[in-house]
Amino acid sequence: MPKVDLSQIEQTNRTGYPAPFDQAVQGRWYRRLAPPTGLQDFSASHVVLKPAAWSSQRHWHDGEDEMLVMIAGEAVLVEDEGRTILRVGDIAIWPKGVKNGHHLINESDEDCVFVAIGGGKKYDIGGGYSDIDLLFKPDGYFRKDGTRYDAERIP
């Protein structure tokens, strides 16, 4: 299998989260690995969290399994059950359909780096957020009452 040259894959901190939910992830820099490498059956992202950055809002996926492998630094995993420190080599897994909102927060003074792996677009049927008035579907972001946010979702 060919080695991936990360320097050849665009790194971005774009988010589709509507304001004010977008602020916490401004220090999240990621590279989408699947499109430039030809992967079609799952998605993968190489993610760098700057100090104080969040990986996302606390969320779950209805149709997509998710796995994370910490490869540098450390971060705090926040889930419904509480907080857990993840360090190099630690793995976290969230089965699809389990409404256990999760995200990482980098509370250290150094960058942390992880790889996130999911089912990809064909399994992206939506999900929700534990702490805020936000749901996601393939075609956008919505309030829990069903009204649409004026924001472009970036899966």
Put a short name on every predicted segment.
Residues 1-41, 127-155:
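A short, N-terminal "cap"/entry segment at the start of jelly-roll beta-barrel domains
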Residues 46-50, 61-77, 117-120:
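Short, conserved beta-strand element in jelly-roll/cupin
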Residues 30-32, 45-61, 99:
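Conserved short histidine dyad/triad with adjacent acidic residue
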Residues 50-54, 74, 83, 98-99, ...:
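Short, charged/polar surface micro-motifs in flexible loops or helix N-caps
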Residues 73, 89, 104:
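Short hydrophobic/aromatic patches on the structural cores and recognition surfaces of FHA
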Residues 35, 51, 88, 119:
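Active-site donor-binding loop signature of nucleotide-sugar glycosyltransferases
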Residues 81-96:
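Short acidic-glycine-tyrosine-enriched beta hairpin
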Residues 38, 96-123:
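Ligand-binding loop in jelly-roll beta-barrel domains
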